Amino acid sequence: KEVGQRLAAGPGNGHYGALSVWVQSFARPRMEFIVGPGAFSPPPKVDSAVLSFEPLPPDQRPERPDLLALVIKVCFQQRRKQLGSIARRCPLAPWLSAAIEQAGITPTLRPEQLTVADFQHISRFGASLLDNPLKN
């Protein structure tokens, strides 16, 4: 059940994190229903959940999953810090700071406040900066 909550959580929810952003970049997860311990033998000490995943259309999925994974990892390693601070302390700072700015995201926000689309915008702008370094 807890994993299902993490997968389906949105920004601002205590369960929202790197796993939420990654999964929701490729599919729409939904908790269908809770299954009590009595449905299993031996019964576990926790409730379980049945989840469904609706794949996103290809044009809504990340163009550079490798870069998205890197942005998510860097941001959620310091989830209580502001994005501007994370970018300044990160070895990727030259392009990460610029990508955050170009994506129009406020650098005083924290990772758990960003939407999945925000993370995708950052990685998309990061890809364009890396592919065209002279435009920096």
Residue ranges and their predicted role:
Residues 1-111, 121-136:
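Class I S-adenosyl-L-methionine
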